[in-house]
């Protein structure tokens, strides 16, 4: 599929750190947060550690920054597809999240937040996280703040799209399928709006979710951007130079002295977007 930069989003078993370390200097660069951060008895136990009180936040983030490439925060729950809404209130308030962000920045690390729903999105943008992952139930006003503060958005359309496209595998009824379609339509509308407002859109697939295959799902995500009205050049940037620039990866663009981390296709995607699925050569 041509993927040469992977940003993992948390793993309680440390496999992400191990793969990152094994791949150093190899073809694929892996960024790992190690464990994310969450509240006890809330969503995210498979990828995050618990923080009990606000007083624990700064020292925990400082300690994590010693080995983490980025700091992952589980700010909200997941979407209840049957109800058509996010489960529960935000796990952290604005003050707690701001301490995490400021501590991470003080240690040279960026933050990214698992977040959907208006309540969580308001906390995320107010605290100044560097990137919002998922961001379902987005609003135009939140996008305005994201554009102003240069907060990136990784919309991860693919997992929800799979749930809608294959309800037979998930056992969804007609009501839930309708909710999924409504969620996807709203998401696409706001992705297009984000593009027009100048929000830093980044293609990320949430690979490993049901029906979301590593590698090829990133190409699917580019197609979701195109379907939402994102121009081809911007959609390609969202999966190439932009994430490299935002996450601080080496060789973010084509310049003398940079690594030639190039994807060669059989044809130009500007002439035929399906050329994105026909990789001829991976350079670098």
In which residue ranges do the predicted regions lie?
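Glycine-enriched alpha-helix->loop->beta-strand junction motifs that scaffold or abut catalytic
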Residues: 126-131, 147-153, 171-174, 198-200
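Divalent metal-coordination and catalytic microenvironments
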Residues: 2, 30, 71, 104, ...
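His/Asp/Glu-enriched, well-ordered alpha-helical/loop segment
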Residues: 106, 110, 171, 175, ...
């Amino acid at each position: 599929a041509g993927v040469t930069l992977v940003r993992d989003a948390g793993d309680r078993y440390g496999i992400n750190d191990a793969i990152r370390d094994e791949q150093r200097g190899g073809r694929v660069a892996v960024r790992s947060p190690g464990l994310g951060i969450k509240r006890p008895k809330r969503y995210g136990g498979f990828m995050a550690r618990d923080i009990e009180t606000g007083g624990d936040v700064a020292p925990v983030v400082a300690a994590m920054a010693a080995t983490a490439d980025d700091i992952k925060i589980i700010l909200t729950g997941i979407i209840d597809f049957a109800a058509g809404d996010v489960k529960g209130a935000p796990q952290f308030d604005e003050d707690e999240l701001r301490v995490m962000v400021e501590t991470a920045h003080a240690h040279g690390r960026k933050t990214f937040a698992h977040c959907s729903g208006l309540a969580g999105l308001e906390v995320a943008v107010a605290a100044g996280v560097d990137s919002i992952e998922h961001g379902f139930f987005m609003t135009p006003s939140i996008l305005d703040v994201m554009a102003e503060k240069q907060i990136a958005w990784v919309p991860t359309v693919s997992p929800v799209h799979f749930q809608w496209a294959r309800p037979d595998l998930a056992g969804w009824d007609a009501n839930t399928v309708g909710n999924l379609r409504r969620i996807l339509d709203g998401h696409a509308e706001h992705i297009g709006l984000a593009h027009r407002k100048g929000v830093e859109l980044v293609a990320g697939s949430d690979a490993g979710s049901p029906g979301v295959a590593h590698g090829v799902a990133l190409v699917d995500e580019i197609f979701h951007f195109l379907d939402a009205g994102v121009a081809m050049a911007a959609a390609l940037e969202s999966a190439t130079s932009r994430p490299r620039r935002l996450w601080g990866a080496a060789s973010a663009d084509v310049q003398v002295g940079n690594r030639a981390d190039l994807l060669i296709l059989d044809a130009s995607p500007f002439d035929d977007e399906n050329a994105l699925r026909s990789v001829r050569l991976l350079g670098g």
